[in-house]
Regions:
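Short S/T/G/P-rich N-terminal loop/turn motif that feeds into the first structured element of a domain
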Residues: 1-55, 64-71, 97-101
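C-terminal structural segments of small proteins and small subunits
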Residues: 66-96
Length: 101
C-alpha cells in the first residue's frame, strides 16, 4: 500500500474566503475516492488552527500500489481538481509519498 500526503498552503488572506476554499477543496478531493481506480481511501482534514503558521489543510490518501498512485495523478478528474486549485486557490503544497508496511 502507498500513502500519499499533501499539505496545502492557501492563497487567500481573507479568513472567510480561506474557509470556503477549505470546504470546497475537501469536497472535491474526497469525491475522487469514488471515481479513480486503485484508491483505497482519501481523507481531507483542516488544521485545528491552534498555531497561525500551520498550513490549513492536509490530504491523506492510500493507494493499492505505486501504479495506482501514478494513475490517480494523471486521471482527468484529479487533473481537473488540481487545475482548479492552481487557479488562485492554493499558494503552495508539500507532498510525501511512502510505502506502508
Amino acid at each position: 500500500m502507498i500513502r500519499h500526503i499533501v499539505a496545502f498552503q492557501l492563497a487567500a488572506s481573507d479568513p472567510d474566503v480561506r474557509q470556503r476554499h477549505v470546504v470546497e477543496m475537501r469536497s472535491r478531493l474526497e469525491a475522487l475516492a469514488d471515481v479513480v481506480p486503485g484508491v483505497i481511501s482519501i481523507e481531507v482534514h483542516p488544521d485545528l488552527g491552534v498555531v497561525d503558521s500551520h498550513w490549513p489543510l492536509i490530504l491523506v490518501s492510500s493507494f493499492e500500489s505505486t501504479e495506482a498512485l501514478d494513475q490517480y495523478l494523471v486521471h482527468p478528474r484529479h487533473r481537473a481538481v488540481v487545475d482548479w486549485m492552481n487557479d488562485g486557490i492554493v499558494a503552495n503544497r508539500v507532498v510525501v509519498d511512502y510505502a506502508v508496511g
